[in-house]
Amino acid sequence: MKKDIHPEYKKVVFLDTSTNFKFLSGSTKGSDETIEWEDGNTYPLIKVEISSDSHPFYTGKQKADKVGGRVDRFKKKYNLQ
């Protein structure tokens, strides 16, 4: 790798603002806000609106809309069911 062209990779705390869930991970994104983590160290705090704690795919609360495709619409239009 070339020197001095890659962003600094460091540990940060992500805060899901919709559920107040926090997790420690690595990132190149920085922040002026900091938070003290469970290990006693202070890390930059990055606020996110959606994480694996609140996203419907991971929580199992997703909606399964049954929207027909073109064939289904054609059959319905011409009463070919």
From Swiss-Prot:
Coiled-coil features, chain-numbered ranges: none
Source taxon at top rank: Bacteria
GO biological process: translation
InterPro entries assigned to the protein according to its UniProt record, in alphabetical order: Ribosomal_bL28/bL31-like_sf, Ribosomal_bL31, Ribosomal_bL31_B, Ribosomal_bL31_sf
Keywords: Ribonucleoprotein, Ribosomal protein
A family per Pfam: Ribosomal_L31
Single Gene Ontology MF annotation: structural constituent of ribosome
Gene Ontology cellular component list: ribonucleoprotein complex; ribosome
Family: Belongs to the bacterial ribosomal protein bL31 family. Type B subfamily.
Quaternary structure annotation from Swiss-Prot or TrEMBL: Part of the 50S ribosomal subunit.
Protein's UniProt name: Large ribosomal subunit protein bL31B
